[in-house]
C-alpha cells in the first residue's frame, strides 16, 4: 500500500507540479527522493528557505507549477519574502514538516514550532494541517486545486505526530 508521502507525490503529479524547491529535510526525504527520480519534475536544492518562495513565484511567471518543501525551523527565514506572494498575488503552496511539537527532544526546535502557524497567518497565508496519514493526500490535493485554480496562498503543516518524533 502507498504511504502518505506517496499520496502527496501522486497529488503533485495529478496537479502538474513540475518544480519542487526544498531545503534537505528528513521529514520530506521520501518525497524528495520521488521528485528526484521523476524526469518530469525539477528538484531545486536551496541554501535557505526564503529562496524557495521566490523560486515558486518565478516558476509561475514561467508557466510552471511549483511547491516549496521546508521544515518548520525555516519558516522564520521566509516571513519577509512572503510579502512577494501576497503583494503580487502569486499562487503559493508550501508543505512544512513540523519539529518542536509532539515528543520533541531538541528544545531549539520548540520556539519556531510555536510561531509557525501564526507567522503564516500574519502574512496572509492560509494554514492547513495533517495529523494522520489518511489526511495527507486529500489535503494536498485540495490545496493544490485552490492554489492553482484561484491563486490562493496555502501552507500545509505536516505534524510531528504524522512524521514521527525523532529520538536522540
What are these regions (language model features)?
Residues 1-168:
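Thiamine diphosphate
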Amino acid at each position: 500500500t502507498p504511504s502518505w508521502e506517496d499520496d502527496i507525490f501522486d497529488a503533485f503529479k495529478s496537479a502538474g507540479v513540475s518544480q519542487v524547491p526544498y531545503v534537505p529535510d528528513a521529514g520530506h526525504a521520501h518525497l524528495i527522493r520521488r521528485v528526484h527520480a521523476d524526469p518530469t519534475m525539477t528538484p531545486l536544492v536551496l541554501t535557505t528557505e526564503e529562496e524557495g518562495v521566490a523560486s515558486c513565484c518565478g516558476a509561475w511567471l514561467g508557466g510552471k507549477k511549483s511547491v516549496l518543501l521546508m521544515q518548520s525551523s525555516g519558516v522564520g527565514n521566509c516571513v519577509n519574502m512572503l510579502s512577494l506572494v501576497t503583494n503580487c498575488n502569486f499562487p503559493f503552496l508550501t508543505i512544512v514538516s513540523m519539529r518542536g511539537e509532539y515528543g520533541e527532544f531538541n528544545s531549539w526546535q520548540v520556539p519556531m514550532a510555536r510561531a509557525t502557524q501564526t507567522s503564516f497567518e500574519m502574512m496572509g497565508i492560509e494554514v492547513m494541517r495533517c495529523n494522520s496519514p489518511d489526511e495527507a493526500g486529500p489535503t494536498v490535493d485540495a490545496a493544490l486545486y485552490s492554489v492553482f485554480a484561484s491563486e490562493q496562498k496555502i501552507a500545509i503543516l505536516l505534524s510531528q505526530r504524522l512524521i514521527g518524533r525523532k529520538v536522540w
